[in-house]
Amino acid sequence: MQKIRFYYISLSGNTSSFVQRVSQYIKTTHHREVESLNIKDLKGKAITVDGPFVSFLPTYLEGGNGIDTGFQEILTGNLQKFLEYQGNFRYCLGIIGSGNRNFNKQFCLTAFQYAEQFGFPVIDVFELRGTDEDVERISKHILASFEKVEEKIDVSY
């Protein structure tokens, strides 16, 4: 079985908290090795990946309503740069969006836009720090994504 890898960006700590909880759930419940990296910690340094991963992306927007009156993504562009660098997006099995439902149509909008731009699915979404139910549900979706890849190739890391 291959290591499960997460690449994400967290600014307020909500996404980091959720990634840690998902990682712990997968480790203890499914006995899988998990590795995660907050892209913010790279401080602009570029890295190339060589195996499957899942991304987590919070939504930070300013201006407009995000749909028909425009918007500007703020603070999370480093994840986009990471995905673009050396074609890293080709290894992304999907993205998990987070946001605040108070923002209506903008809830997790950035994750859906990244999915469209890069051609990978939105695996799931959660609000703010996520609930225990979110952790369990999303962990199952992540494991299913990795199992599909493992069925296609014989991976022994």
What are these regions (language model features)?
Residues M1-Q72, T76-G77:
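N-terminal beta1-alpha1-beta2 submodule of the flavodoxin-like/Rossmannoid cofactor-binding fold
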Residues V49-Y157:
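FMN-binding flavodoxin-like domain, especially the glycine-rich phosphate-binding loop
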